[in-house]
């Protein structure tokens, strides 16, 4: 056995002795368990009384025993969508009649919470709207203190004027330019299109993660972030409201800017949420089905209704309750598409061919649900609905076939001998007459003149297409007024004020500016290589073409032109993302006043020309002042350096062997000429 080293017992006793962590007598701990172990205490198992998964449903119909089973089946089916129901109790009175409320127990508490969220305020019929609450809420409200304490008065915050951008005396338009400075980090600059040079209003670093979007009337600009989206406005673009919807990919404003729709997944499974812009409250949410997620909803022009297409139906919701119109959907078997009129509460939809029944385009008046016009169509493969901005006309582009080929299982359908029709509905005329225009060539693009009675189409082969312009008049068939042949364009962009149009090839980056009132003469044909977007300003005076970094990585930026195609400004901007003009709200002037101004426009010319001259004079004066300031700065710098050079003369003479080289006489200089051969040429003389 090994011997212990001397002093080993003492060392062992030192290591085996437990340290004393007890508080000294009289010690008072000032740190609570919640502050010290808050994260662990939050995970501590809590006592449950077994009612967390129970909901109370009020305002159910009061029925006799003979109708009770039917009531149970309807309500149980509705509430079973939220989870597994373990137990249901419908209290009854002495006569066996229900008392107007029920208790439902779910398998999990989360399912009960989901039922409260989805079915509270659900309308069963005209007389019964559910009030759904958790059973535990009764205990919570029982513990409300009897003594009422008034809420803390919050300081009034003066909101910035959201419409100051339309108060500019010279009516200059605004625009924003976005550029990506880092991944998921976009800088946005706001500018005013002043003359002779644009004026910068505000520049925000890290303003959005992806891109921005203006509201339809230009009041707000929306930015995208991981937690959701935010809207900004006012003179300095302050944050007006934020909407928590993680992963939002796309947003839509209602036409009157009362509501915002966000599209994107969330942890709770909600993909589409409708928000109240002024309060920030969630009005209703939907889960996307197998149909397209983006732009599922269509708004009426006055924000009174919003609609979406379902399977063989249209769901129309009333605002602000967002209940279904008349508490039921409109059943339309075979519906394939629909669209609202931009100026009236009229829906246009089309139905595909079914069982030897022809396809049909229908105009329906809302909220009466009255069909005001029908048009049957034969041999239809597809339809596209195009409303004119003023709501005067509806054009239905019909893709028709001469022959239909199906396989044995009728799963694969091929359309042969394709040709195309334009069905023009005259919305402002009695009984809404319909004219038809047939085109035998492939239709590549269609565009209405926003204010006017013309539409344009691109047709033919993609590499050698034609552009045709049609005019629609009352009582006569639409007439072809001009055809421009062999034009390699892919898109048509009308001015918001009509008359002028840009024919663009967004593959090659070529553009042609056309005046539709001057025999469709091409006034200019500029190029902007790799341009991917075209933006008209709201007044129709300027056009911007842009090369986005989403498409290419080199030579990104934008060009600005007049409505006649004359280049005004070229801007090269690294990682340029998008250019957006700020929309303008409709004018508040009555139509009679507008006509009066147009009639007397000549007398305003002198005032406008005088303003232009003053502006140019002011700009010239500012330029001269700027040049004079630059010259003064240079002369100040020059005189400073000359004085410094003179102060260093003694040092300079000493370093040069006491020879003053600043004032050398020409007699003291020896001139030496050196000649050398630079080039030799041999020329043969005949």
Swiss-Prot record:
Record keyword Signal present: no
Positions of transmembrane segments: none
Ranges where the record places region Disordered: 1-29
Molecular-function GO terms, alphabetical: RNA binding; translation initiation factor activity; translation initiation factor binding
Recorded coiled-coil stretches: 590-642
HAMAP family named in the record: eIF3b
SUBUNIT field: Component of the eukaryotic translation initiation factor 3 (eIF-3) complex. The eIF-3 complex interacts with pix. Interacts with mxt.
Similarity annotation: Belongs to the eIF-3 subunit B family.
UniProt-recorded name of the protein: Eukaryotic translation initiation factor 3 subunit B
Protein's gene: eIF3b
């Amino acid at each position: 056995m090994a011997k212990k080293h001397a002093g080993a017992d003492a060392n062992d006793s030192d290591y085996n002795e437990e340290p004393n962590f007890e508080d000294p007598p009289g010690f008072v701990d000032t740190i609570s368990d919640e502050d010290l172990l808050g994260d662990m205490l939050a995970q501590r198992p809590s006592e449950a009384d077994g009612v967390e998964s129970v909901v109370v449903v009020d305002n159910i119909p009061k029925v006799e025993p003979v109708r009770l089973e039917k009531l149970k089946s309807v309500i149980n089916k509705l509430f079973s969508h939220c989870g597994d129901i373990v137990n249901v109790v419908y209290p009854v009175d002495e006569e066996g009649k229900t008392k107007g409320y029920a208790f439902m127990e779910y398998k999990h508490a989360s399912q009960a919470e989901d039922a409260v969220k989805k079915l509270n305020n659900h309308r069963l019929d005209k007389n019964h709207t559910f009030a759904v609450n958790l059973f535990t809420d009764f205990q919570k409200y029982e513990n409300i203190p009897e003594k009422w304490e008034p809420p803390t008065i919050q300081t009034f915050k003066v909101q910035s004027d959201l419409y100051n951008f339309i108060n500019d005396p010279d009516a200059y338009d605004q625009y924003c330019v976005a550029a990506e400075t880092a991944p998921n980090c976009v800088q946005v600059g706001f500018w005013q299109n002043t003359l002779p040079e644009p004026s910068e209003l505000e520049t925000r670093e890290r303003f959005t993660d992806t891109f921005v979007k203006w509201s339809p009337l230009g009041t707000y600009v929306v930015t995208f972030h991981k937690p959701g989206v935010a809207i900004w406005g006012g003179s300095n673009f302050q944050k007006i409201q934020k909407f928590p919807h993680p992963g939002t990919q796309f947003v839509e404003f209602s036409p009157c800017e009362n509501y915002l729709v966000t599209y994107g997944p969330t942890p709770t499974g909600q993909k589409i949420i409708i928000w109240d812009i002024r309060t920030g409250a969630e009005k209703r949410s939907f889960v996307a089905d197998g149909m397209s997620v983006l732009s599922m909803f269509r708004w009426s022009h006055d924000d009174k209704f919003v609609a979406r297409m379902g399977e063989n139906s249209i769901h129309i919701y009333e605002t602000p309750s967002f209940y279904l119109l008349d508490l039921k959907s409109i059943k339309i078997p075979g519906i394939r598409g629909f669209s609202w009129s931009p100026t009236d509460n009229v829906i246009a939809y089309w139905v595909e061919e079914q069982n030897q029944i022809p396809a049909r385009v229908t105009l329906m008046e809302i909220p009466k649900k009255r069909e005001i016009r029908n048009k049957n169509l034969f041999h239809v493969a597809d339809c596209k609905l195009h409303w004119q901005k003023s709501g005067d006309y509806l054009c239905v582009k019909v893709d028709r076939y001469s022959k239909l080929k199906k396989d044995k299982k009728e799963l694969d359908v091929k359309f042969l001998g394709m040709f195309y029709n334009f069905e023009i509905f005259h919305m402002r005329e009695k009984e809404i007459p319909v004219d038809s225009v047939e085109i035998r060539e492939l239709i590549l693009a269609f565009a209405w003149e926003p204010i006017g009675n013309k539409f344009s189409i691109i047709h033919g082969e993609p590499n050698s297409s034609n552009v045709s312009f049609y005019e629609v008049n009352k009582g006569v068939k639409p007439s072809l007024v001009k055809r421009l042949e062999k034009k390699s364009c892919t898109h048509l962009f009308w001015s918001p004020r009509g008359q002028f149009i840009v024919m663009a090839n967004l593959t090659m980056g070529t553009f042609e500016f056309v005046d539709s009132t001057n025999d469709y003469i091409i006034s200019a044909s500029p190029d902007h290589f790799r341009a991917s977007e075209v933006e008209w300003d709201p007044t129709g005076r300027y056009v911007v073409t842009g090369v986005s970094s989403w498409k290419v990585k080199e030579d990104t930026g934008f060009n600005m032109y007049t409505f006649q195609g004359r280049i005004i400004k070229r801007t090269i901007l690294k990682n340029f993302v998008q250019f957006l003009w700020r929309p303008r709200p409709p004018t508040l002037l009555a139509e009679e006043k507008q006509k009066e101004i147009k009639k007397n426009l000549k007398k305003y010319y002198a005032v406008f020309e005088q303003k232009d001259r003053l502006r140019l004079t002011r700009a010239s004066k500012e330029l001269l002042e700027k040049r004079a300031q630059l010259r003064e700065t240079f002369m100040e710098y020059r005189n400073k350096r000359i004085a410094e050079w003179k102060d260093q003369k003694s040092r300079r003479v000493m370093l040069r062997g006491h020879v003053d080289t600043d004032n050398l006489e020409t007699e003291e200089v020896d001139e030496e000429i050196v000649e050398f051969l630079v080039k030799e040429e041999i020329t043969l003389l005949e």
